[in-house]
Amino acid sequence: MQEQYRPEEIESKVQLHWDEKRTFEVTEDESKEKYYCLSMLPYPSGRLHMGHVRNYTIGDVIARYQRMLGKNVLQPIGWDAFGLPAEGAAVKNNTAPAPWTYDNIAYMKNQLKMLGFGYDWSRELATCTPEYYRWEQKFFTELYKKGLVYKKTSAVNWCPNDQTVLANEQVIDGCCWRCDTKVERKEIPQWFIKITAYADELLNNLDKLDHWPDTVKTMQRNWIGRSEGVEITFNVNDYDNTLTVYTTRPDTFMGCTYLAVAAGHPLAQKAAENNPELAAFIDECRNTKVAEAEMATMEKKGVDTGFKAVHPLTGEEIPVWAANFVLMEYGTGAVMAVPGHDQRDYEFASKYGLNIKPVILAADGSEPDLSQQALTEKGVLFNSGEFNGLDHEAAFNAIADKLTAMGVGERKVNYRLRDWGVSRQRYWGAPIPMVTLEDGTVMPTPDDQLPVILPEDVVMDGITSPIKADPEWAKTTVNGMPALRETDTFDTFMESSWYYARYTCPEYKEGMLDSKAANYWLPVDIYIGGIEHAIMHLLYFRFFHKLMRDAGMVNSDEPAKQLLCQGMVLADAFYYVGENGERNWVSPVDAIVERDEKGRIVKAKDAAGHELVYTGMSKMSKSKNNGIDPQVMVERYGADTVRLFMMFASPADMTLEWQESGVEGANRFLKRVWKLVYEHTAKGDVAALNVDALTEDQKALRRDVHKTIAKVTDDIGRRQTFNTAIAAIMELMNKLAKAPTDGEQDRALMQEALLAVIRMLNPFTPHICFTLWQELKGEGDIDNAPWPVADEKAMVEDSTLVVVQVNGKVRAKITVPVDATEEQVRERAGQEHLVAKYLDGVTVRKVIYVPGKLLNLVVG
């Protein structure tokens, strides 16, 4: 073998071998235990970033380890290929989204291969191909027939100048990103899937997911937001309809002093006919996009509609206000306000001088002080007529029962979760397979017209979707009648909700899934991806699995047994202030830094001499120009080094700080491994290891080898603390580098140790391990080698350290066999120079012996 470690030579050779041998292609095999290891599929943006590399390295380490345990391991990869960025890039580069996407896929596929990930490439899929999305379209038509799909109007961002719908990220400070026109909210008909029909199951099954992070489960619980309460109906004077509100606190009902409705509510619209101030307020609300996160912090505003509602229990008239914090799409578009016991209602009532009536006593039994804020804690009722003196639970039930008996209340379970709106007014997505006949009938596209293919050879004007701009595209005939196709496309979360199942049978032509293959591989054993997907993707992913189960395609309830959310990758960020006061971010690669004795950055400048401001470590991002290109690092150090650093620098679920000095350290370690194998093999053949003939030192070294195997196995397999596994291998390597290699058994032991080290490193650094395994004459390819097993006998401590004291003072530490008698220990202690010195010419009056630990000789 060559003396120097040259990753650029060995890595491409090993990758070619895997390709030619199709090493990682698998098929169902009932005789083997399966393991399905899946990383979230990438969006083909053009280049891999370090976040991808971290995600996929973790997955590859787990997959290769499970393979070495003898399991049938599926690790597939594909491309989440539809989406808005392709439209922007196509306009910018004067091309169409399809060629841009396919070029990116080809480029990124090479990057994945360059990193040595062991994927089954025969299962690769791209979600933008009709072969993939046809089954999603077919499934959608079946959900429609089951009553799980419906159409209703819903608000979108509308640019009146371009006459087009904008995604949230295309609205900048309330204006269109392209023409800067003020964006309006417009109601348009859209398709929805009834995820709410599965709300209870999605919530309850979270308890089955023992190996999902609690943070993700909590986020999903809160997102689904199940609550129990009462729906209450109010009569409104001079208004044709009643108003219905939902409350989780009926115990506070006697303190309800006003109602609030959304600006879009029919009551507000009616009142606005003769109220210009209200009409202007409704207009203002229509054009503010309100995300829930902003709701909490934005200024609460409202206008009195002039209508009065009648409190069903007191008969009092209470005002009805239109307010910007009530949304039509949530619940009934109306809420009851109890300003004494709800902080938002309190602030609104204080601002507009509305009545605040306390009905709950403070914890000490006194009347609450409402001069500064509402009392939101639960407590005992007062000021509430017949309900005075009841505690929260008793009052909840008594008031709910009374309202129900009067016919104006009903107990209800409510969810925060809303149905999934899957319509997008974009081009680069799967066409929604619905048609409208001439007579207005809406129906699913007939099976013989599926898939509805998205034309790829299009011209993008950057404004209107090509399939909306071309009136001919939508024309079709159904049952001999002219019909128009739906020109909206699916939300791209649709494709990523079921791809994991299609990987089990990517070539299947008879339907969405081949149940036999799907049920062999599913559920996924471990799913790896970022925590940012906790509610959207990971909820739709679970929902789709249940839909496929209820369609008879899969027989499990949940799609993935374990979820691992990898931490973000951080890097140093630097900027200098330009002439106009703007920040110019400089890549850490281009920063020349000075550090103090603790390694902290104290000064930095760039090649042009700008003094740089160092802002610390932050997430790698385009905006701060602090992304590190994985390709550059692989070309500089090799894929194995990059992979090793990624797994060693921090626990998988914590943030990782990119430090090139750490990468250099990983590289030095691999060079040491190479050097040790080189020096060992240069001495020629090795004799068989005879464990019965080993010296104490050799036994101790062998004990370290097998203890390391046991620790690494536990760290990777059970604890998934990959960084501590690598640290243990490094520690063993340090001992091996110092071990004697002269004797026959020294070299036999070194051979056993190196074969173990190479196999333990294999999941992390597969190229160098593949090569060194061959140099060590390991059996077959390392890809088919079994994981090393710790020898229990070798780990038994057959000697122990005994502390020897004379009159309570430590004079020596001696190594003795575990089964040595007290006499043997005394004899051995007497051979120590220092002990003998203190025993010379004196009488031993007493011996205190703690077996295997301590020998104290009391002399006088």
Curated annotation (Swiss-Prot):
Main location: cytoplasm
Keyword hit for Aminoacyl-tRNA synthetase: yes
Subcellular location: Cytoplasm
Keywords annotated in UniProt: Aminoacyl-tRNA synthetase, ATP-binding, Cytoplasm, Ligase, Nucleotide-binding, Protein biosynthesis
Motif annotated as 'HIGH' region, chain positions: 42-52
Residue ranges annotated as motif 'KMSKS' region: 619-623
Designated name of the protein: Leucine--tRNA ligase
